[in-house]
Amino acid sequence: YYGELSHDALKPWTNANFRFFGGYQRDFYKADGGVVRSMPYWGARINQKVNNRLDLWAGYTQRNLGSTHSPYPFDEVEIPKELTYGGTVHLTDKDDVSLNIRQNAENGNIEYKNLTYHRDLHSFDAYFTYKAVQKTWEMKWTAKDF
C-alpha cells in the first residue's frame, strides 16, 4: 500500500511553484508476508517557468529503506537519496528538448543524464531519449486523446 501527503504548490515568486511531500510505501512480495519492504520517504520540488520557451526544475527525494530491499531487480530503488534537476526548451508549440539529471546525493555521482526530444503528434506523443551515462537510446510513443 501507499500514501502521500502534500499541499497546493507554494508560489515563492512569479511563475515558480514549490512543494514539500512525504509518504509511506509498503510492498509485500510473498502472499504470506514473508518478504516486506517498508519505505517512508520525503522530498521537495521547485519548478520555474523562466519565459515562454524555458522551464527549469530541481528536487530532492529521500527514500528511507528498511533492511529489506526488493527481491526483484526491476523493483529496486537505485538512488535512495536523489537530486534531480534540469530544464526544457520549447522549440515550437509541438516540439521541445529536455535535459534531466539524476544525481546520487550520497556520493555525488551523476547516475542519469538524459536528453529527450519530444514531439506532439496530435493523438500521440513521441519521445526520443539519449541516456548519456548509459550510452543508449530509447524511443517511446504514448497515445493520448482517446
Give the residues covered by each predicted segment:
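Long, low-hydrophobicity, solvent-exposed regions enriched in small/turn-prone and acidic residues
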Residues: Y1-F146
